[in-house]
Regions:
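Conserved N-terminal entry element of GNAT/NAT acetyltransferase domains
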Residues: 1-9
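Conserved acetyl-CoA-binding loop of GNAT-fold acetyltransferases
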Residues: 117-126
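A short, internal acetyl-CoA/4′-phosphopantetheine-binding micro-motif in the GNAT/acyltransferase core
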Residues: 72-82, 106
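A short helix-loop-beta-strand connector motif used in the catalytic cores of GNAT acetyltransferases and
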Residues: 42-53, 71
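Conserved GNAT-fold acetyl-CoA-binding loop/helix
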Residues: 11, 16-43
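Conserved beta-hairpin
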Residues: 50-63
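Conserved acetyl-CoA-binding loop-helix of GNAT-fold acetyltransferases
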Residues: 83-96, 114, 118
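Conserved GNAT acetyl-CoA-binding A-motif
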Residues: 96-108
Length: 143
C-alpha cells in the first residue's frame, strides 16, 4: 500500500469515503447529522489538515488520514476494505511521518476505540459532547 498526497480535487471522492465509513461505524449519527457535517468537512475540515490517502489498484481512494498540530483529526476507511490494513498503514504514517501523538474518537464507536488502543493510544480524558456541541461523547487519546 502506498501513501499518496491529497489534492483539493480529491475532496469529493474523500467525502464519499467519509460518508461510507460513518454509515458503517457510527450508528449513533443520524441522516440529519451526516448532512450537517458534509459541507463543514468539505469547506473547513479538509483544507485545515495535512491529508494523505491510500488508493486501490484502479486509483480510487479507499482511506485517508488528516493531521494538524500532532493530532489525527480524521481517519476514515471504506467499509469494504476495513480489516485489510489500510487504517493501520495510514495511522502509522501519521505517527511516523506527521508526528501525530493525539486523537479524539467517538466513545460510541467501540471498534475505533479498540483500534487506537491496539495501536498504542491511551485514553487521557473524556468530553460529554463533540466540538460542534452535539451529544456525542469524545475520548481524548494520546500515545
Amino acid at each position: 500500500m502506498t501513501i499518496e498526497n491529497v489534492l483539493p480535487e480529491d475532496y469529493a471522492e474523500m467525502l464519499k469515503v467519509w460518508e461510507n465509513s460513518v454509515r458503517a461505524t457510527h450508528g449513533f449519527i443520524t441522516e440529519e447529522d451526516i448532512e450537517f457535517f458534509k459541507p463543514i468537512i468539505m469547506e473547513h475540515a479538509f483544507p485545515a489538515v495535512s491529508l494523505k490517502c491510500v488508493k486501490n489498484e484502479s486509483g480510487s481512494i479507499v482511506g485517508f488520514v488528516g493531521v494538524h498540530d500532532a493530532k489525527v483529526e480524521m481517519l476514515f476507511v471504506l467499509n469494504e476494505v476495513r480489516g485489510q490494513g489500510v487504517g493501520t498503514v495510514l495511522l502509522q504514517h501519521a505517527i511516523e511521518q506527521l508526528a501525530a501523538t493525539k486523537i479524539d474518537v467517538n466513545e460510541q464507536n467501540p471498534q475505533a476505540v479498540g483500534f487506537y488502543q491496539h495501536m498504542g493510544f491511551k485514553i487521557e480524558s473524556r468530553s460529554p459532547i463533540d466540538d460542534m456541541g452535539k451529544p456525542f461523547p469524545i475520548l481524548h487519546m494520546t500515545l
